[in-house]
Amino acid sequence: MSSDKAKAFDAQFPTYKSEFQIPTFESLGIQNSKYSPETNSIYLCGNSLGLMPRNTTELINRELQAWSSRGVEAHFNHSHPQGTDWVDIDLPLLPLLAPLVGAKQNEVAVMGSLTSNLNALLIHFYKPKGKRTKILFEKQAFPSDYYAFLNIVQVFGYDASHLIQIEIPKGETYIKTETILDVFDKYEDEIAIVCLPGIQYYTGQFFDIAKITKHVKTSAPDVVVGWDLAHAVGNVPLSLHDWGVDFAAWCSYKYLNAGPGAIAGIFVNEKYTEQNKPENYKPRLAGWWGNNSSQRFQMLEKFDPIASALSYRQLNPSVLDCVALKSSLEIFNKVGGMLSLRDKSLAMTQFLQDILTKSNYYIEQGETDVNKFGFKIITPLDPNQRGCQLSLLFQPHRDEKKQNVMERVFEYLHQHAIICDERRPDVIRLAPLPLYNTFEETRIGATRLLEALEAIKDDYI
């Protein structure tokens, strides 16, 4: 693909790069005589850690100043005219976050971390009864999810046999929706919870959340449907309320650009938070920040949960984490949310795919020769079945790191400040983000990758 075509796309789709801090060759410690130290990197790694919004520093410094000048009194009397009293620091985030996940404001909360939130939701929603004791999820789930699922069945006295894992069929690179539905139908009478990723972290597959949720709830209304949206929130449009999802959890340090280890979020369908009706209340991991805010500081020995997802909060949230997340959510709000970004995302990832698939080093997904030199795209080639990420599987594999194709390509990219993500042993994930990446950057990144393969091909062919 020519630079002219990339620039034509860039003229069509706006970029919001100026809202973010972009690492340079110098700041990354990369020395390459072909580039000046102040040259910006091409950052295709927002699926691992999003870039820092420029406004984050100002917002965090505002809170540090409030702490410095007011101390504990900033909880109820912030020092800045635009500051939020710390007692309510997370509340301004809710109207910004809810549209990104397609929720009502009373269905979202900012709290904890992804795995701690998933554990809290499982404790609340996993209610094994009779034959319904099992959790259905994917075999290739992120390890932390597996640990959470295994732990919760063990808490109730069961073992790993109560975990049903859906595997990628032999010869395929991802799980088709029909496979998921077939496995559910096979074990329907034994399943208590279905919990899948909105987007699979390794392959980049965008699961059909609406279809899967509807199928499960139609076939077995008592089965709870939850989603790990770590790679979906801020990446693709979501409509959790309208889709009838029961619960979801996500992190904020990837596509939401809230910083490493950032505060996370949850969705709980409002039908579960009508606490004023005793028959609808279910015990959960409770804490004082989920209690009625008007009584919170009365120190009563009575838990009166807030009638919203906020009732799942256990403790007061980190002020610095909340304002870091707010700085990014305000950008999403400013540009019109995910629907306004999705068209660019679809076009940009397709642009990347078109460059790669026209290469002599591209290997079809169904190719079985593992010694053939090049790469496969293990992400669905259908744009509607993925987010912005493409996952490339390089071959042939070599146990020696210095001889492994993926490692050598990754090193070449890094020396040219093409920042992406490696998943050993053989995968590189490329994620052009519509907020701060351009088509020209995407073209250059793909070009450098193909250059790397050209440079080493004689060692394998």
From Swiss-Prot:
The keyword Hydrolase applies. GO terms for cellular component: cytoplasm. Its main location: cytoplasm. SUPFAM superfamilies: PLP-dependent transferases. Pyridoxal 5'-phosphate binds at L114, T115, F142, P143, S144, D145, D228, H231, Y253, W288, N316. Pathway: Amino-acid degradation; L-kynurenine degradation; L-alanine and anthranilate from L-kynurenine: step 1/1; Cofactor biosynthesis; NAD(+) biosynthesis; quinolinate from L-kynurenine: step 2/3. It is found in: Cytoplasm. Its EC number is 3.7.1.3. Keywords: Cytoplasm, Hydrolase, Pyridine nucleotide biosynthesis, Pyridoxal phosphate. It catalyses: L-kynurenine + H2O = anthranilate + L-alanine + H(+); 3-hydroxy-L-kynurenine + H2O = 3-hydroxyanthranilate + L-alanine + H(+). GO terms for biological process: 'de novo' NAD biosynthetic process from L-tryptophan; anthranilate metabolic process; L-kynurenine catabolic process; L-tryptophan catabolic process to kynurenine; quinolinate biosynthetic process. One of its GO terms (molecular function) is pyridoxal phosphate binding. Its cofactor is pyridoxal 5'-phosphate. HAMAP family: Kynureninase. Homodimer. NCBIfam families: kynureninase. Belongs to the kynureninase family. Catalyzes the cleavage of L-kynurenine (L-Kyn) and L-3-hydroxykynurenine (L-3OHKyn) into anthranilic acid (AA) and 3-hydroxyanthranilic acid (3-OHAA), respectively. This is Kynureninase. It comes from Lodderomyces elongisporus (strain ATCC 11503 / CBS 2605 / JCM 1781 / NBRC 1676 / NRRL YB-4239).
